Amino acid sequence: MNGEGISDGLSAERKVEIRVRKNGRKDKVIVEKSAAQGLPEGWIKKLEITNRSGRKTRRDPFFIDPKSEYIFQSFKDASRYVETGNIGHYARKLKESDIEDDDSGNGKTVLRLEYVDKRSADDVLEKEKTIDDVRRSKRRNLSSSDEHSKNCKMTSDLSIVTSQVLEDLGKKEEVKDPIEKQLIAKRVTRSQTKASTTEEVVVDLKRNLSSSNAKSEKDSVNSSVRSQKPKKEAVMKEEEEQDSSEKRITRSKVEEKKNELSNSVARRTSKRLAGIELEPTPELKTRAKVQRIVPLDDEPTPELKTRTKVQRVVPPDDEPTPELKTRTKIQRIVPPDDEPTLELKTRTKVQRILPPDDELTPELKSRTKVQRIVPPDDELTPEFKTRTKVQQRIPPDDGRAGKCKQPVNHVTTSGSKKTEIPLNKEVAQSCNEQSSQKPHAAAATSNNRVSADSAVGIQNIGKAVGRKPSKDKKTLKSPLIVYELNPVFHLDGYKQKEEMSPVSPLSCQTSATKCEKTAAGKRVGRSSPKANLTTSVKPTQISPLRSPNKGKQPHPSDSGSAIQRRNKLANEYSNSSVVRGTCSEVMEKSTNSFSSAFDSTLADLCKDPCIAFAIKTLTGESLCLLNTPAISSNPINNHTKQKGVSFTPETPGNVNTCSEKLVFPSPPPGANIWQDPCIDFAIKTLTGAIPIGLDEPDTKSKSQGMTSTTAATQEAKGRQNNCDYMTNKTVGKPDDLRFTQSFSKD
């Protein structure tokens, strides 16, 4: 191809070329040449059209610059070269396109016959053949040691031939492409190095086999080998470096391809879809949950203890039996140091009544039996509770219906007379007739009177007096609880020497005190032991219900002035049902005085809304008191009438006077709730007093073994202290509004 034909032919020229690959396949290529549009004059557009099997015709455009003879594969590269002079990465000259790799990736070379010189190719092939002949001749010469001289000549001839070939090739390749020079030079140098290695082997063999050769020959051979050694080593190093660099480049390219593939491949984020096994998760157990709820350092609350124990002992679907509930309450509900709250009082009934080491009394045994009979899921209604408790406390019928026997610590003189307080005037006569019975009759019916007292006493609120219950089941079957007529519940500072007498707890109470007239009748002085002998009233003289046939007998320890004063008071208040003592702090434990104290204390305490709310909360029902009048706006009249027992305020002129009128109505329906220990504890919590009265059975059992004379003297002193204190205690100022709140029936 000449530059003249390209410049002259502006019209499209079409030629057909046949290109041969290395594998012998031939491709038919149509080449069209025309003037390039959009480029300076002289630029040629070359279009190669090829037909591929299974493909469409392929058109490859090339743009050729006639001056620089550069070939550009796209119009964009050609225009950039015209404007800026930048050749780019894909530009090549016209002669470089004679031998190029096919873009199909088959590694096939295409020879363009128009540009290949046949003579140069034939020369290269002939040279290669000569080199192969030389190698073969060398191998043959090594087989025999006799031909050593010939081999030396052959090596010299081989060196001469190779030098001549290299000179001829250098002259011819100056005209041709420099790329072909490099290829041929590489081939020749490789063959030359191989020949040099064979020469070294030959030299070694010569030394071993022919030791009788001439020194001249050895010197000539050694000199030739020494002269060629540095050249050979330099060539070997260069080839090794090139090979290593080529290998490194190929390895780096392969690694880059792998990284690209690994990054471009989509990965699964789900372990389930990827087939990765999940880590086993721990199973949550109920015990572990319960242990997390319970605090580690602090003592668990009673409610939490009960829940955890029930969950571990009883199956989750079954309800725990009442027996199990009772055990858990006794063992775990009450904390060791803190006082249980009001919410837990209902649950800890059995625990507060019973010490863990004491034995159950008959009353508590009956209560536990009732709890076991009733199903655990249904809660006992207040009506059912009242029925069960009343049945436990009513004594067997002894033929004396209609009378409520008070636990009277009767005065036992030489005749050991027994006195009882009837409920009304109609029964008083029968009571007086039966009062002449023998002392053993009183002892026989002591248990009945104790149970009757508990039935009547439940309607009155008061503080129990005494010590712990007795453990003797033979002498006492049910506890005897005696209440005070004292809404304030303070007994400190009133005990005297005679209080520690084991005969009767009724005598162990306060004596007359030195009081100042302050608001609400607060006591400010201590008791005077001399006052015990000056003011005392016998129950037979105080009560207007006593039979007149009995007469007024002076007490052995009473003085004349005290007897006259008591007689005067009995005459003044015989026609009225008003008894003084409103807001009195303490009543003596005499049987006659406490019989009226029950009703008055109940009426006073029921007016307190806190106690009323506690009763309603614990029992589920409100306490409805019969014959309880409504409370008026007058604070003095609010304390005058209460459930059959009325009080009148005491004036300063009426000091040291005492009289009482005993009226005992039938017990109300809600009276049984007052014997509940939880209600007793609630009253103790609300009023701030200490419960007393649990030691009554113990002292009662002890008093039965004492002599009658000692009991008579102690009871006489108790009655004196009782009446004297009531007369000394005044109502206070008119503005005192103690317990003035009304308690409604709902």
Swiss-Prot record:
Name of this protein: Methyl-CpG-binding domain-containing protein 13
Localization: Nucleus
Location, primary (coarse class): nucleus
Biased composition (Basic residues): 465-476
PROSITE patterns (UniProt xref): MBD
Gene name in the database record: MBD13
Task performed by this protein: Probable transcriptional regulator.
UniProt entry keywords in alphabetical sequence: DNA-binding, Nucleus, Repeat, Transcription, Transcription regulation
Keyword Nucleus: yes
InterPro entries on file: MBD13-like (IPR038945), Methyl_CpG_DNA-bd (IPR001739)
Signal sequence, start to end: none
GO cellular component: nucleus
UniProt free text on domains: The methyl-CpG-binding domain (MBD) functions both in binding to methylated DNA and in protein interactions.
Region Disordered, annotated ranges: 131-157, 169-283, 295-328, 348-479, 518-562, 696-746
Domain MBD: start-end pairs: 29-104
Amino acid composition bias (Basic and acidic residues), ranges on this chain: 169-180, 244-260, 732-746
GO terms assigned for molecular function: methyl-CpG binding
Compositional bias (Polar residues): 190-199, 427-451, 529-546, 702-730
Residues spanned by motif Nuclear localization signal: 13-20, 44-51, 256-263
